[in-house]
Amino acid sequence: AKTVNCPAIDGILEEADDVSGDVEDKEVLDAALIASAQAVEHYEITRYGTLIAWAKQLGRSDCANVLAKNLKEEEATDRKLTEIAESKVNLQAAE
């Protein structure tokens, strides 16, 4: 398989790198990094949603099913990041 760069993800990662260089407070940095990770997750979620719709439209339920499993993993990761942020990291960053 050929590796393809994604300019959108590259931009999110570049932004995260810029923010991490600007933030000195460790707790604030942790919150910012979680926000960046969630930006990546949200992008991936939208892409999987689109790919699933296309696969279904093309009659490829086999592909749609595999993509749906990946989508569920991305959504679970996003929920975990939200839980971490809301239960601890954001509170510490606000202090």
What are these regions (language model features)?
Residues 77-85:
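Amphipathic alpha-helical coiled-coil segments
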Residues 1-7:
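Acidic (E/D-rich), amphipathic helical modules within compact regulatory domains
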Residues 89-95:
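Short, charged, intrinsically disordered terminal tails
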Residues 2, 68-71, 77-78:
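Metal- and O2-centered redox machinery and metal/ROS homeostasis
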Residues 3, 61-65:
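Short, solvent-exposed positions on alpha-helices
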Residues 7-61:
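Acidic/histidine-rich alpha-helical segments that form the ligand environment
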